Structures are given as C-alpha cells and as structure tokens.
C-alpha cells in the first residue's frame, strides 16, 4: 500500500517555492500527497488570473492534490497587511484541516517559511489523528520576523518568542538546513539529536542548465554582470549593493551592472535608494520572472549575488538562492554571516563578505572583476561540483522521505 503524506504550507504552486517540487518528488517516489496551502499572492499580494476566494480551491499539480484555505492577501506589503497575512492563513487553515480528519496519512509534513504560525494547522491534525509531524525549518522565528518588521516592544517580542518556540516544541521531528541551525533547534526545544535532522535544501534540476539568451547577452555585452535573483525584502538587505556601487563610482569603475531579477516589499525602497545615491547607471531592475527562466539570468551573469540582513540567527540558515546559484555554475558573491558564506568558502565557489559590509563587498567585486576569466570559471565549476555532491535533488529527496516516514 502506498504511503500518504499531508503537506501543510502557506505557500505552494503557482508561487515560486521549493515545496512544489518536493511534493512532486514525493509523488515520483510512489507516495500519495495532499497539500493544504493558501491563496497564491506572494510576493506582491496580487492573486494570479484564475484565482479567487472561491475559485480553484481544489486543484491537481503533477499528481499532487492541492487544497486551498483562505488568507488575507498581503497587498501593498505594508506592515499591517503582512501581519494580517501571517495570522490569517493559520487561522483559516486550522478550520479547513478539520475536513481532512476523515483521511488517513502516514505523516504530516510542514514546510515552514514565514510565518512560524503556519505550523499550527499541522499540529491540529497531528494531535487529533495521532500522526507524526515533521517540520522543515526554513525561516527561524522569531528572528526572521525581526528582520522584516521592526518590533521593539519588549512584551510583543517575548510573546512572539514564546509562541514561536511553542510551535517548534509541538512537532515530533524537525529538519534544519545546517548544523548550526540544528544545534539551535535542539537547544530551544529540548529534543534529542535523533529527532532533529540536518538536510540542506536542494534546487530543481532546471537550475543545472546553461541557457543563453542572445538578446540579453547583446544588451549587457559591455558590462561585468552581477545578478541578484529572488525576493526583495528587508531580510535580503539588497541595499548593500547600492552602497558598494557608490564606492565603485567613486573609484571610476563604470562597466559593472547589477541586474536585479525579482520583486518584493522592499523593491520600491531599493529603487528610491539607488536614485538617492546617484548610482542608477549601475542597476537594472527587471521585475519578477518565471522561476524556470532563472537559468537564463544565471548563465548571463559573471557573478551571482547573495546578501542577507545582519543577524546572528539568520546566519544559521543557508538562503535558497545560494543553493540555486551553486547549481548555476557561476562564482557567488555573498554578503552573509554564518552558514551561507561558509558553504561558499568550503566549496571554493566565490568570495564572501560579512552581512551589511559594503566595503568588503566592493573589494570582492573589484577582485572578481579584475581576476582572469579562467579563475572565475574555476570558481563556477567548484560551485556546480559541490551542488552535485551535496545538494542534488535525488539525494536530498530520499533523505527527506526517509526521515519523515521513519
């Protein structure tokens, strides 16, 4: 008899989150999968065509049965709308999950990005049906929240901390992306080491392709191209690139271009900061693109850029874009504390700088820009080699399945 897994995740296809491919991978491994997710509206708070409060509430995606709960859209990406979005999905999904009580699953799997409260409906089903719950911790709370919303009130901070830890403790098993995050989860939950696994993120196989676009290559042929691809929010701290560009301008280096592919709550702020600093000639904002187009921009790049806001606990995680970048086979420029930079150093796949250190980033850009092309190509080859050895889809999927169903 086939094993059955219920996945709880606020975000799912058609939003660009890796859980969609993980669910597909489970099906490929002869597992029946149901998903309880929200209404697609990330990152700009706008529903794609064909979706609504009562439209497409049940779908099929690559053999995965998808069920959608209500949530308040994050339209406008104001602090209030994000807060309402964060609390509305777990609220509505906790009622929606009751309709699943007549179904039998071997495991519940929560893919926890922000907010941590999306774990709650998974806890509800797990406890009522006595089915083990495994949560993949992609965003550590409350630390990730503080990188997005500036919460200074001590009472609120303590409340968020206690409720976040409560959710982690109620899971039967946890998955961390890195050894450092593993240690932190063991410490805050009191769980045994056997109940907390370290499994890195993988990226979809299409990231491993080199796809040339003649039009883009012609457009940027006279530039050293640094590509940032992904969400643009306070947690990413993309503005560090603006400060580095100002140093490049003062140094008289004019043929470097930051190509920003993506959208998010901070995009307008970053564009305004670029204008304020007078470095518009160093930036092109291309907006959001289909995730399957990312190999085009990775192939275009001379270097791929991965920043993260300064935070001791954010440094415990490896951003998903770092994994995707390494598969792309290009040198990676990080501006990250902790694990995200450590993996690049270990793989000899690029140059690293501390979070928020625009001077160090500027120096690394100049170093990479000035080095022979063969040395950059060697870094890119190292990145792709490390990807196939440690982050391949087949290996990570099997590790996930074994741990969840054990």
Give the residues covered by each predicted segment.
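Carbohydrate-associated surface elements
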Residues: 39, 180, 199-202
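N-terminal subdomain of nucleotide-sugar transferases
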Residues: 1-60
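Membrane-proximal helix-turn-helix segments that form the acceptor-binding/catalytic region
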Residues: 124-128, 155-174
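A short, well-ordered alpha-helix in the C-terminal region of glycosyltransferases
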Residues: 126, 360, 367, 374-389
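Nucleotide-sugar-dependent
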Residues: 236, 286, 290-297, 304-326, ...
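Nucleotide-activated donor-binding/catalytic signature segment of Leloir-type glycosyltransferases, i.e.
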Residues: 261, 268-295
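Conserved donor-binding/catalytic core segment of Leloir-type glycosyltransferases
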Residues: 219-236, 241-246, 259
């Amino acid at each position: 008899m086939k094993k059955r897994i219920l996945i709880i995740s606020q975000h799912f296809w058609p939003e660009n989150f890796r859980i969609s491919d993980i669910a597909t991978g489970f099906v490929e491994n002869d597992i029946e999968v149901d998903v309880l997710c929200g209404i697609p509206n990330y990152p700009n708070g706008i529903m794609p065509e064909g979706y609504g409060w009562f439209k497409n509430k049940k779908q099929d995606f690559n053999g995965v049965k998808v069920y959608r709960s209500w949530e308040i859209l994050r339209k406008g990406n104001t602090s209030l709308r994000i807060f309402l979005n964060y609390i509305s999905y777990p609220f509505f999904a906790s009622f929606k999950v009751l309709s699943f009580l007549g179904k039998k699953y071997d495991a519940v799997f929560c893919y926890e990005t922000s907010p941590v409260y999306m774990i709650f409906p998974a806890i509800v089903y797990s406890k009522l049906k006595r089915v083990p719950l495994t949560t993949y911790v992609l965003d550590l709370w409350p630390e990730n929240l503080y990188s997005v919303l500036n919460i200074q009130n001590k009472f609120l901070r303590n409340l968020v901390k206690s409720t976040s830890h409560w959710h982690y403790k109620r899971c039967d098993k946890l998955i961390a992306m890195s050894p450092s995050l593993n240690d932190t989860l063991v410490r805050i939950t009191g769980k045994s080491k056997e109940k907390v696994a370290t499994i890195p993120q993988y990226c979809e196989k299409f990231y491993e392709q080199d796809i040339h676009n003649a039009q883009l290559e012609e457009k940027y042929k006279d530039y050293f191209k640094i590509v940032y691809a992904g969400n643009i929010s306070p947690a990413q701290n993309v503005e560090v690139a603006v400060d580095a560009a100002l140093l490049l301008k003062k140094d008289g280096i004019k043929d470097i271009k930051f190509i920003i592919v993506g959208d998010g709550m901070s995009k307008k702020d970053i564009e305004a900061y670029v204008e304020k600093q007078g470095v518009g000639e160093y930036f092109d904002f291309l907006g959001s693109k289909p995730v399957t187009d990312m190999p085009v921009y990775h192939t275009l790049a001379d270097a791929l850029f991965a920043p993260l806001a300064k935070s001791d606990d954010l440094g415990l995680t490896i951003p998903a874009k770092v994994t995707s970048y390494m598969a792309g086979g290009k040198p990676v420029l990080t501006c990250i504390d902790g694990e995200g930079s450590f993996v690049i150093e270990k793989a000899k796949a690029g140059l690293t700088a501390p979070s928020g250190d625009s001077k160090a980033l500027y120096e690394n850009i100049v170093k990479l820009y000035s080095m022979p092309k063969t040395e950059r190509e060697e870094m890119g080859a190292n990145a792709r080699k490390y990807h196939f050895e440690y982050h391949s889809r087949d290996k990570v999927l099997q590790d996930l399945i074994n741990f969840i169903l054990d």
